[in-house]
Protein backbone atom coordinates (compact mmCIF):
# COMPACT_ATOMS: atom_id res chain seq x y z
CA UNK A 1 0.00 0.00 0.00
CA UNK A 2 2.82 2.39 0.84
CA UNK A 3 4.50 1.68 -2.48
CA UNK A 4 1.27 2.41 -4.34
CA UNK A 5 0.80 5.71 -2.50
CA UNK A 6 4.40 6.70 -3.23
CA UNK A 7 3.93 5.94 -6.92
CA UNK A 8 0.76 8.04 -6.95
CA UNK A 9 2.49 10.96 -5.27
CA UNK A 10 5.38 10.84 -7.74
CA UNK A 11 3.09 10.78 -10.77
CA UNK A 12 2.17 14.48 -10.91
CA UNK A 13 1.73 17.71 -8.97
CA UNK A 14 -1.77 16.51 -8.10
CA UNK A 15 -0.39 13.37 -6.47
CA UNK A 16 -1.86 14.15 -3.05
CA UNK A 17 -5.28 14.78 -4.54
CA UNK A 18 -5.10 11.54 -6.51
CA UNK A 19 -4.00 9.65 -3.39
CA UNK A 20 -7.04 11.05 -1.57
CA UNK A 21 -9.27 9.88 -4.44
CA UNK A 22 -7.85 6.37 -4.21
CA UNK A 23 -8.15 6.20 -0.43
CA UNK A 24 -11.04 4.77 1.57
CA UNK A 25 -11.95 8.19 2.93
CA UNK A 26 -15.56 9.30 2.61
CA UNK A 27 -16.22 11.73 -0.23
CA UNK A 28 -16.92 14.58 2.18
CA UNK A 29 -14.14 13.71 4.66
CA UNK A 30 -11.64 16.36 5.73
CA UNK A 31 -7.97 15.44 5.29
CA UNK A 32 -5.39 17.36 7.34
CA UNK A 33 -1.73 17.06 6.33
CA UNK A 34 0.76 18.34 8.92
CA UNK A 35 4.42 18.86 8.01
CA UNK A 36 6.43 19.53 11.16
CA UNK A 37 9.89 21.15 11.15
CA UNK A 38 9.38 22.33 7.58
CA UNK A 39 12.68 24.25 7.74
CA UNK A 40 14.44 20.93 7.17
CA UNK A 41 13.31 21.14 3.55
CA UNK A 42 15.43 24.26 3.10
CA UNK A 43 18.43 22.41 4.50
CA UNK A 44 17.74 19.53 2.12
CA UNK A 45 17.39 21.96 -0.78
CA UNK A 46 20.71 23.66 -0.01
CA UNK A 47 22.89 20.66 0.78
CA UNK A 48 21.77 18.36 -2.04
CA UNK A 49 22.19 19.08 -5.70
CA UNK A 50 20.56 17.91 -8.92
CA UNK A 51 17.62 15.54 -8.50
CA UNK A 52 17.33 16.27 -4.77
CA UNK A 53 16.68 19.93 -5.52
CA UNK A 54 13.95 18.84 -7.94
CA UNK A 55 12.48 16.60 -5.24
CA UNK A 56 12.26 19.51 -2.80
CA UNK A 57 10.41 21.65 -5.34
CA UNK A 58 8.14 18.77 -6.28
CA UNK A 59 7.26 18.19 -2.63
CA UNK A 60 6.32 21.85 -2.20
CA UNK A 61 4.18 21.70 -5.35
CA UNK A 62 2.36 18.64 -4.02
CA UNK A 63 1.39 20.59 -0.91
CA UNK A 64 0.43 23.76 -2.78
CA UNK A 65 -1.72 21.95 -5.35
CA UNK A 66 -3.48 19.95 -2.64
CA UNK A 67 -4.21 23.06 -0.57
CA UNK A 68 -5.42 25.16 -3.50
CA UNK A 69 -7.70 22.68 -5.30
CA UNK A 70 -11.39 22.46 -4.42
CA UNK A 71 -12.33 18.88 -5.35
CA UNK A 72 -11.16 17.33 -2.09
CA UNK A 73 -11.24 18.84 1.37
CA UNK A 74 -7.50 18.78 1.92
CA UNK A 75 -5.90 21.16 4.40
CA UNK A 76 -2.15 21.64 4.81
CA UNK A 77 -0.41 22.89 7.95
CA UNK A 78 3.34 23.43 8.03
CA UNK A 79 5.34 24.38 11.11
CA UNK A 80 8.74 26.04 11.04
CA UNK A 81 10.97 28.28 13.09
CA UNK A 82 10.18 31.93 12.44
CA UNK A 83 13.77 32.71 11.42
CA UNK A 84 13.29 30.48 8.36
CA UNK A 85 10.15 32.18 7.01
CA UNK A 86 12.19 34.19 4.51
CA UNK A 87 13.51 30.97 2.98
CA UNK A 88 10.02 30.23 1.65
CA UNK A 89 10.82 32.54 -1.27
CA UNK A 90 13.11 29.81 -2.65
CA UNK A 91 10.02 28.01 -3.95
CA UNK A 92 7.55 29.62 -6.34
CA UNK A 93 4.15 30.11 -4.74
CA UNK A 94 5.19 29.06 -1.24
CA UNK A 95 5.79 32.54 0.18
CA UNK A 96 2.41 33.68 -1.13
CA UNK A 97 0.64 30.71 0.44
CA UNK A 98 2.39 31.26 3.77
CA UNK A 99 1.45 34.95 3.73
CA UNK A 100 -2.22 34.05 3.30
CA UNK A 101 -2.35 31.68 6.27
CA UNK A 102 0.54 32.60 8.55
CA UNK A 103 0.12 32.32 12.30
CA UNK A 104 3.03 33.21 14.58
CA UNK A 105 2.95 31.27 17.83
CA UNK A 106 3.82 33.65 20.67
CA UNK A 107 6.38 32.71 23.27
CA UNK A 108 5.11 31.28 26.51
CA UNK A 109 4.56 33.80 29.27
CA UNK A 110 5.71 33.10 32.82
CA UNK A 111 2.39 31.57 33.85
CA UNK A 112 2.44 29.21 30.86
CA UNK A 113 6.05 28.27 31.54
CA UNK A 114 5.11 27.49 35.13
CA UNK A 115 2.39 25.12 33.90
CA UNK A 116 4.86 23.50 31.47
CA UNK A 117 7.18 22.78 34.40
CA UNK A 118 4.63 21.64 36.97
CA UNK A 119 2.48 19.55 34.62
CA UNK A 120 4.91 16.69 33.87
CA UNK A 121 6.04 16.51 37.51
CA UNK A 122 2.43 16.27 38.68
CA UNK A 123 1.66 13.55 36.13
CA UNK A 124 4.64 11.62 37.50
CA UNK A 125 3.12 11.78 40.97
CA UNK A 126 5.81 14.01 42.47
CA UNK A 127 6.29 17.59 43.59
CA UNK A 128 9.01 20.20 43.30
CA UNK A 129 9.96 22.85 45.80
CA UNK A 130 9.00 26.48 45.29
CA UNK A 131 12.70 27.32 45.23
CA UNK A 132 13.32 24.96 42.30
CA UNK A 133 10.24 26.21 40.45
CA UNK A 134 11.40 29.83 40.65
CA UNK A 135 14.96 28.83 39.75
CA UNK A 136 13.74 27.03 36.62
CA UNK A 137 11.54 29.94 35.60
CA UNK A 138 14.47 32.33 35.94
CA UNK A 139 16.90 30.02 34.12
CA UNK A 140 14.78 29.28 31.06
CA UNK A 141 15.86 32.40 29.18
CA UNK A 142 14.35 33.77 25.97
CA UNK A 143 15.90 31.60 23.25
CA UNK A 144 13.21 30.14 20.95
CA UNK A 145 14.56 26.61 21.38
CA UNK A 146 14.90 26.82 25.16
CA UNK A 147 11.89 24.60 25.90
CA UNK A 148 13.68 21.41 24.73
CA UNK A 149 16.60 22.42 26.96
CA UNK A 150 14.17 22.83 29.87
CA UNK A 151 12.62 19.45 29.08
CA UNK A 152 16.02 17.79 29.13
CA UNK A 153 17.02 19.49 32.39
CA UNK A 154 13.78 18.37 34.04
CA UNK A 155 14.26 14.82 32.78
CA UNK A 156 17.81 14.70 34.16
CA UNK A 157 16.73 16.24 37.47
CA UNK A 158 13.95 13.66 37.77
CA UNK A 159 16.34 10.82 36.98
CA UNK A 160 18.87 11.99 39.58
CA UNK A 161 16.13 12.51 42.19
CA UNK A 162 14.56 9.08 41.61
CA UNK A 163 17.92 7.33 42.03
CA UNK A 164 19.16 9.24 45.06
CA UNK A 165 16.15 10.22 47.16
CA UNK A 166 13.14 8.80 48.92
CA UNK A 167 10.32 9.38 46.43
CA UNK A 168 8.28 11.12 49.13
CA UNK A 169 10.72 14.05 49.02
CA UNK A 170 10.10 16.84 46.48
CA UNK A 171 12.51 17.65 43.67
CA UNK A 172 14.77 20.46 44.87
CA UNK A 173 17.52 22.82 43.83
CA UNK A 174 20.24 20.40 44.97
CA UNK A 175 18.98 17.75 42.52
CA UNK A 176 18.86 20.35 39.76
CA UNK A 177 22.37 21.63 40.41
CA UNK A 178 23.73 18.09 40.57
CA UNK A 179 22.95 17.58 36.88
CA UNK A 180 24.47 20.91 35.81
CA UNK A 181 21.43 23.18 35.89
CA UNK A 182 19.72 24.57 32.80
CA UNK A 183 22.93 25.86 31.26
CA UNK A 184 25.01 22.70 31.49
CA UNK A 185 22.61 19.75 31.89
CA UNK A 186 22.41 18.79 28.23
CA UNK A 187 26.10 19.38 27.52
CA UNK A 188 27.17 17.52 30.65
CA UNK A 189 24.90 14.59 29.77
CA UNK A 190 26.22 14.38 26.20
CA UNK A 191 29.80 14.46 27.48
CA UNK A 192 29.00 11.60 29.87
CA UNK A 193 27.74 9.53 26.95
CA UNK A 194 30.85 10.43 24.95
CA UNK A 195 33.05 9.35 27.86
CA UNK A 196 31.51 5.86 27.67
CA UNK A 197 33.23 5.24 24.32
CA UNK A 198 35.28 2.05 24.27
CA UNK A 199 38.48 3.80 23.19
CA UNK A 200 40.01 7.08 22.08
CA UNK A 201 39.53 5.91 18.50
CA UNK A 202 35.81 5.50 19.14
CA UNK A 203 35.67 9.02 20.62
CA UNK A 204 37.30 10.24 17.41
CA UNK A 205 34.74 8.36 15.33
CA UNK A 206 31.95 9.85 17.49
CA UNK A 207 33.25 13.32 16.70
CA UNK A 208 33.28 12.50 12.98
CA UNK A 209 29.71 11.18 13.11
CA UNK A 210 28.42 14.41 14.64
CA UNK A 211 30.52 16.51 12.25
CA UNK A 212 28.91 14.63 9.36
CA UNK A 213 25.31 15.24 10.47
CA UNK A 214 25.68 18.90 11.50
CA UNK A 215 27.12 22.06 10.00
CA UNK A 216 27.05 25.83 10.34
CA UNK A 217 25.37 28.00 7.75
CA UNK A 218 26.71 31.26 6.39
CA UNK A 219 24.98 33.13 9.20
CA UNK A 220 26.63 30.86 11.80
CA UNK A 221 23.28 29.14 12.33
CA UNK A 222 23.41 25.46 13.14
CA UNK A 223 22.02 23.25 10.38
CA UNK A 224 21.05 19.61 10.62
CA UNK A 225 22.37 17.33 7.89
CA UNK A 226 20.62 13.94 8.15
CA UNK A 227 22.81 11.24 6.62
CA UNK A 228 22.33 7.56 5.83
CA UNK A 229 24.17 5.15 8.09
CA UNK A 230 26.06 3.63 5.17
CA UNK A 231 27.36 7.06 4.19
CA UNK A 232 28.42 7.75 7.78
CA UNK A 233 30.59 4.64 7.68
CA UNK A 234 32.29 5.96 4.54
CA UNK A 235 32.68 9.51 5.88
CA UNK A 236 34.08 8.49 9.26
CA UNK A 237 36.18 5.60 8.01
CA UNK A 238 34.82 3.51 10.88
CA UNK A 239 33.44 0.02 10.49
CA UNK A 240 29.71 -0.66 10.47
CA UNK A 241 29.64 -2.16 13.96
CA UNK A 242 31.41 0.84 15.51
CA UNK A 243 29.12 3.40 13.89
CA UNK A 244 26.02 1.50 15.04
CA UNK A 245 27.44 1.28 18.56
CA UNK A 246 28.01 5.05 18.59
CA UNK A 247 24.52 5.80 17.31
CA UNK A 248 22.88 3.40 19.75
CA UNK A 249 24.74 4.96 22.67
CA UNK A 250 23.28 8.37 21.83
CA UNK A 251 19.69 7.15 21.37
CA UNK A 252 19.02 4.86 24.33
CA UNK A 253 15.92 5.68 26.42
CA UNK A 254 16.59 8.81 28.46
CA UNK A 255 19.35 9.82 26.05
CA UNK A 256 17.63 10.81 22.83
CA UNK A 257 20.36 12.88 21.19
CA UNK A 258 20.11 11.01 17.89
CA UNK A 259 17.24 9.79 15.74
CA UNK A 260 15.59 7.48 14.81
CA UNK A 261 14.29 6.26 18.19
CA UNK A 262 15.93 3.33 19.92
CA UNK A 263 13.21 0.86 18.89
CA UNK A 264 13.93 1.38 15.17
CA UNK A 265 16.35 -1.18 13.74
CA UNK A 266 19.31 0.33 11.88
CA UNK A 267 20.25 -0.52 8.30
CA UNK A 268 22.63 1.11 5.85
CA UNK A 269 19.70 3.14 4.47
CA UNK A 270 18.55 4.42 7.87
CA UNK A 271 18.83 8.22 8.04
CA UNK A 272 20.64 9.41 11.17
CA UNK A 273 19.84 12.87 12.53
CA UNK A 274 20.18 14.86 15.75
CA UNK A 275 16.96 15.10 17.72
CA UNK A 276 16.86 18.90 18.00
CA UNK A 277 18.80 21.96 16.84
CA UNK A 278 19.34 23.01 20.45
CA UNK A 279 22.01 20.30 20.71
CA UNK A 280 24.18 22.32 18.32
CA UNK A 281 23.78 25.44 20.44
CA UNK A 282 24.17 23.92 23.90
CA UNK A 283 26.61 21.00 23.66
CA UNK A 284 30.02 22.61 24.14
CA UNK A 285 31.97 19.75 22.56
CA UNK A 286 29.82 19.77 19.42
CA UNK A 287 30.21 23.54 19.07
CA UNK A 288 33.97 23.04 19.20
CA UNK A 289 33.88 20.24 16.61
CA UNK A 290 31.72 22.15 14.13
PLM features: residue spans?
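Amphipathic helix/helix-loop-helix segment enriched in hydrophobic residues with interspersed Lys/Arg
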Residues: 1-290
